[in-house]
Amino acid sequence: NNPSTILKVIRKFPDTIDNKNEQLVVILEDAVTNEIKHLHIKPYCSNHSYFGYDYKKTNNTNLIFEGSNIPENTVFMESPNKFDSGEYNYGVECNIVGLTHHGVSEDSIVVSEAVLDKFIFHTYHKKTISFGNNLFPLNIFGDKNSVKIFPNIGDKIGIDGVIMALRKHDPLMAVVEQTEEAYREYDSITDKVICCEYPEAEVVDIHIYKNVTSNSIMPAELEKQLNDYHYSIKKYYEKIVEFYQTLRRNRGDNLNISKEFRQLVIEAMIYTKEPDKIVLTYKNEVLEPWRVHLTLKVKIRPTIGFKWTGDFGDKGVGCTILPEEQMPIDELGN
């Protein structure tokens, strides 16, 4: 990458909404080609359907401010498994022994409880929840003084794994099903309960779409949290559009932008368009009044059934987990 100058830094969420998700869009100008491009900086990486990891910040993050000159090939965030020398730590050093043991059969292996924490990894799960036409959310995370229909960024879901609960609108039952107290409890039989199969997962990102062209049965009092996030995301996109329009006015035909930045601007324009001027669809279906995307980080600690592999093609399935004091030792106590 060529040296560049940072023109604009835009944060996705203000501190009033979230101070745990440091997502930024950094808009830069290439010092060689004068192309306008952008970096999307977020605290985690997940390019797989599930697997991912938390980034490790480098000292170069101190250079992220407007007007800053960025040297070529500058790295802001990198893998936590990379040493300062540039080498990758792609495994865990463990003592291994091959011997006859009652816990071993075929390709099974015995693993010490003491080393399991060294193999902890993260997966990232995406949940998409649409509602508003026939279903409305319940205030299961709030109380009589606040509305909280889903966990905020940085919150961990409970041991029951519940993320959100939706109830079908019934005009005949509204007098008992749509009271302040009824909003705070769900019925696992009659209500639609959305869960994550991994309890205590952490919410790391939230994205919300609001489609005002759809007919909504949403009680206004249950929309506060939704509106707070939607407003913040809209302001984030408005800043992107506003800066792009400033560039167009100042540079005219000389404006040179990357394909990726152009796509970001289009996305921002769609989100900030006058609500009655555009109909939001997904796979040719008109979106419901609200569509919520939640990204959850799950910490996985290996246990029985997980597979371990070595550097030389050796592998096995953990079939027995033993306390450290029950593991075999040699004459030197190793």
Region annotations inferred by a language model:
Residues 1-334:
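Conduit-forming functional cores of very large proteins
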